[in-house]
Swiss-Prot record:
GO process terms (BP): maturation of SSU-rRNA from tricistronic rRNA transcript (SSU-rRNA, 5.8S rRNA, LSU-rRNA); translation
Molecular functions per Gene Ontology: RNA binding; structural constituent of ribosome
Alphabetical list of Pfam families matching this protein: Ribosomal_S9
Coiled coil: none
Transmembrane segments: none
NCBIfam families: PRK00474.1, uS9_arch
Keywords: Ribonucleoprotein, Ribosomal protein
Source organism of the structure: Aeropyrum pernix (strain ATCC 700893 / DSM 11879 / JCM 9820 / NBRC 100138 / K1)
Family: Belongs to the universal ribosomal protein uS9 family.
Protein name in UniProt: Small ribosomal subunit protein uS9
Keyword tRNA processing assigned: no
Gene Ontology cellular component list: cytosolic small ribosomal subunit
C-alpha cells in the first residue's frame, strides 16, 4: 500500500538546498527542527507555507514534513523549502498501480496538486535557472565599471 511510504525530495534556489522528508502523520512541519508556525522570519514563513495552503488542510493533515535547509540567504532558503515541499507532496501521493481504488484516488490527488502548483507558480516544481553573475576583472561588480573622467 502506498500510504506507508516515506518520500525524500529536494529543492534548490540560488545557493540554498533543501531536503524534505515526507511521511504519514498528523500535519506537522519542521524547518531545521523549528515548527513552521513559529519560524522567526515572517515573509519566509509565508512563502514556505504556500504549497501547504494550496494543497489544503485535508492533504496537510495526512503527512508530517521535516526539512533540512542550508546555504544561501533567507529568501533563497524559503524558495528551496517551498520547492522541496511541493515536489514531495506530489511524489508522496503518486501511485503507479492503478488497480486499487485507494491508489487511483491518491494518484488523482497527486495530479490535482501538480496542476494547482503549476497554475499558481511554476517555480514550485520547476527550478529557477537564474544565478548571480560573477564579478569581472577591474570592475566594482559584474557590470559596473570605473567612472570615466575626461578632465
Amino acid at each position: 500500500m502506498a500510504v506507508e511510504r516515506i518520500v525524500i525530495s529536494t529543492g534548490k534556489r540560488k545557493r540554498a538546498i533543501a531536503r524534505a522528508v515526507i511521511r504519514p502523520g498528523r500535519g506537522r512541519v519542521w524547518i531545521n527542527g523549528v515548527p513552521l508556525e513559529i519560524y522567526p522570519i515572517e515573509m519566509a514563513r509565508i512563502k514556505m507555507m504556500e504549497p501547504l495552503l494550496i494543497a489544503g488542510e485535508g492533504v496537510r493533515s495526512l503527512v508530517d514534513i521535516r526539512v533540512r535547509v542550508e546555504g544561501g540567504g533567507v529568501m533563497g532558503q524559503a524558495d528551496a523549502v517551498r520547492m522541496a515541499i511541493a515536489r514531495g507532496l506530489v511524489e508522496f501521493f503518486r501511485c503507479e498501480e492503478s488497480d486499487d481504488e485507494l491508489c487511483r484516488m491518491m494518484d488523482k490527488i497527486s495530479r490535482d496538486l501538480r496542476t494547482a502548483f503549476l497554475e499558481h507558480d511554476r517555480t514550485m516544481l520547476v527550478g529557477d535557472p537564474r544565478r548571480t553573475e560573477p564579478e569581472k576583472y577591474m570592475r566594482y561588480s559584474a557590470r559596473r565599471r570605473w567612472q570615466k573622467s575626461y578632465r
